[in-house]
């Protein structure tokens, strides 16, 4: 009788260990797959950057970057996005500690910062269009709106993903699946920060000089 019980416990332990290994492998595959997606996104952004570089001087008699860019405004945008990257890092640290409430709180702060960034970007676009400097004004402005707008759409998608993730953590806790999702969103969010630094340098900083 005792041998049968012992064998049952060993079998159960083996099954639990197998399930844990399977979950670990599944999470690793998900993160690897997301890295592949980010590489395709790199190609996409590189193509749009190249297009902008070709068209930057095609102003068709309209304004150049030096005429329309407001560096102090864009610096505030940049600072907000960079701080949001730090707050997301704090959310990850909280998740590693198993602090569900702290993780959700830091994700909420990150969401608010990201929303503020998008709000400022929309305000910038509205101001330019109201001044008659919309995307149809010149090839330069068309490429500018495409590049900056595409980054903004990615940030908006990240914000939507963040809302869904906060709801999942709130209802299910910091499960292995949710931790994997947090890792993937972390890669995405930091990737967008790096892209924005490139946008700020190539488009705004070089354009304003």
UniProtKB/Swiss-Prot annotation:
The places in or outside the cell where this protein is found are:
Cell inner membrane
Assigned GO CC terms:
cytochrome o ubiquinol oxidase complex; plasma membrane
Q: Where this protein primarily resides, as one coarse class?
A: membrane
CDD domains with a match to the protein in the record: Ubiquinol_oxidase_III (cd02863)
Look up the signal peptide feature and give its range.
none
Q: Which UniProt keywords apply?
A: Cell inner membrane, Cell membrane, Electron transport, Membrane, Oxidoreductase, Transmembrane, Transmembrane helix, Transport
Choose any GO biological process term that the UniProt entry carries and state it.
aerobic electron transport chain
Q: Which residues cross the membrane?
A: 30-50, 73-93, 103-123, 144-164, 187-207
Membrane topology (Cytoplasmic): 1-29, 94-102, 165-186
Membrane topology recorded in Swiss-Prot or TrEMBL:
Multi-pass membrane protein
Q: Which GO terms describe its molecular function?
A: cytochrome bo3 ubiquinol oxidase activity; cytochrome-c oxidase activity
- Give the matching InterPro entries: Cyt_c/ubiquinol_Oxase_su3 (IPR024791), Cyt_c_oxidase-like_su3 (IPR000298), Cyt_c_oxidase_su3-like_sf (IPR035973), Cyt_c_oxidase_su3_a-hlx (IPR013833), Cyt_c_ubiqinol_oxidase_su3 (IPR014206), Ubiquinol_oxase_su3_dom (IPR033946)
Positions in the Periplasmic compartment: 51-72, 124-143, 208-209
Its assembly, as annotated, is: Heterooctamer of two A chains, two B chains, two C chains and two D chains.
Give the record's family classification.
Belongs to the cytochrome c oxidase subunit 3 family.
PANTHER family of this UniProt entry?
CYTOCHROME BO(3) UBIQUINOL OXIDASE SUBUNIT 3, CYTOCHROME C OXIDASE SUBUNIT III
Which NCBIfam families has this protein been placed in? CyoC (TIGR02842)
Q: What does this protein do?
A: Cytochrome bo(3) ubiquinol terminal oxidase is the component of the aerobic respiratory chain of E.coli that predominates when cells are grown at high aeration. Has proton pump activity across the membrane in addition to electron transfer, pumping 2 protons/electron.
* Protein name per Swiss-Prot or TrEMBL: Cytochrome bo(3) ubiquinol oxidase subunit 3
> What is the organism lineage in this UniProt record?
Bacteria, Pseudomonadati, Pseudomonadota, Gammaproteobacteria, Pseudomonadales
Q: Which gene encodes it?
A: cyoC
